[in-house]
């Protein structure tokens, strides 16, 4: 093996590197003193005079002429020496390799350029038992192939040569999660060092194993479904293993209070028209129209459940917030005719009918079983609900007998009728002689400031109909 001097590392390719070298970069005088012998007992001479050219694919053809002196190559006894005339050309094949600077320990600490001599051939194949041939043989399966003219060719392909002159990929990060992806680089370094020291050949490029497929459960386990993250109890709630009717948030229904039923429209219609209204009355009722009615249910069990749920005796009795205006006023009905006293403490009311007592007890309990279907407002009495519904419908069934004005409530019509009656009394009490002459400027068919009527209305006092309400003023 012949080793050249250490030179500066030039980042060029093989062919470019050969063209840049001058002819006298390694003179014979310096090479004889520092190089080692290629073959045993061979004299170092000067046949290395010039380089004729570079063959393709990284092949270096060096024509060795015997201008200065002959080269005697004694071979071992097992091989016959080949005579080499002075005027015959020798062909050499060599390989240049520039070792990059590895970040760690390198198997080439000196960083030199190695020239591996494959052999000297002259028409026949050189001995394969030499150290250089054996080292190249151990490095590649088919190291050399000799052509008809004695030119040695390399068996390695161009990608292998490109890998030798290109820096290797950076080492992968060795972390806990990447331990399965890449192997320890010390195994490659130790193998390369052993191969170099034993066979003096370049180690094969380290081949990193490809990453494991993503389907490997050791690397990235595929989650089959989300229930793997949840405990068994949550899985049952998510997937509904208890059945399709399972509620996500179950809660006891006995703790909730059932809202009061709506008053049927038939009850409201019957009450408005003055007909009998059927309904479920409270305890002790004698068939009155008070009490809630079941919406759309006629079974006895539902009626009993509703009656028990809305039983006034089950609710606490509270004192009346607004006391009576005349609490000590004697009733017109004798006491023995009012057998239903109020059970609330501090209330001395007595009633002659049980439905009246039931309606009164709702004042203490706050029970309002009648609900408006339009605004969902609750009422304690059905007549209050009926009157309230008329505010939504605009119905005014009560008309005034004197002026024809309509009202939604009978008490409103009664209050309005009193106005006409007071006016009639004033007309009858005023003497006809004391009526002064009316003034057309101030009289508009109404009542004058003195309280007398206009002359236009005096003719109608004798039993005729009263004037419209718009032409009269309200008097206290």
UniProtKB/Swiss-Prot annotation:
Natural source organism: Homo sapiens (Human)
Linked pathology is: Neuropathy, congenital hypomyelinating, 1, autosomal recessive: A severe degenerating neuropathy that results from a congenital impairment in myelin formation. It is clinically characterized by early onset of hypotonia, areflexia, distal muscle weakness, and very slow nerve conduction velocities (as low as 3m/s). Some patients manifest nearly complete absence of spontaneous limb movements, respiratory distress at birth, and complete absence of myelin shown by electron microscopy of peripheral nerves. Charcot-Marie-Tooth disease, demyelinating, type 1D: A dominant demyelinating form of Charcot-Marie-Tooth disease, a disorder of the peripheral nervous system, characterized by progressive weakness and atrophy, initially of the peroneal muscles and later of the distal muscles of the arms. Charcot-Marie-Tooth disease is classified in two main groups on the basis of electrophysiologic properties and histopathology: primary peripheral demyelinating neuropathies (designated CMT1 when they are dominantly inherited) and primary peripheral axonal neuropathies (CMT2).
Q: Where is the composition biased (Low complexity)?
A: 127-141, 429-476
Q: Which residues belong to zinc fingers classed as C2H2-type?
A: 340-364, 370-392, 398-420
Put simply, this protein is called: E3 SUMO-protein ligase EGR2
InterPro entries the UniProt entry points to: EGR_N, Znf_C2H2_sf, Znf_C2H2_type
The cross-references to SMART domains, in alphabetical order and at most eight, read: ZnF_C2H2
Q: Do you know which SUPFAM superfamilies this protein is assigned to? A: beta-beta-alpha zinc fingers (SSF57667)
Briefly, what is this protein's role? Sequence-specific DNA-binding transcription factor. Plays a role in hindbrain segmentation by regulating the expression of a subset of homeobox containing genes and in Schwann cell myelination by regulating the expression of genes involved in the formation and maintenance of myelin. Binds to two EGR2-consensus sites EGR2A (5'-CTGTAGGAG-3') and EGR2B (5'-ATGTAGGTG-3') in the HOXB3 enhancer and promotes HOXB3 transcriptional activation. Binds to specific DNA sites located in the promoter region of HOXA4, HOXB2 and ERBB2.
- Note down the stretches annotated as region Disordered: 127-178, 275-300, 318-341, 412-476
Which domain of life does this protein belong to?
Eukaryota
EC class (word): transferase
- What keyword terms does UniProt attach to this protein? Acetylation, Activator, Charcot-Marie-Tooth disease, Dejerine-Sottas syndrome, Disease variant, DNA-binding, Metal-binding, Neurodegeneration, Neuropathy, Nucleus, Repeat, Transcription, Transcription regulation, Transferase, Ubl conjugation, Ubl conjugation pathway, Zinc, Zinc-finger
Q: Where is the composition biased (Basic residues)?
A: 415-425
What mutagenesis or variant effect is reported for residue 387 to N? In CMT1D; uncertain significance
Instruction: Quote a single Gene Ontology cellular component term.
Output: nucleus
Query: What Enzyme Commission number does this protein have?
Result: 2.3.2.-
Query: Can you summarize the PTM annotation of this record?
Result: Ubiquitinated by WWP2 leading to proteasomal degradation.
List localization entries: Nucleus
Q: Gene name?
A: EGR2
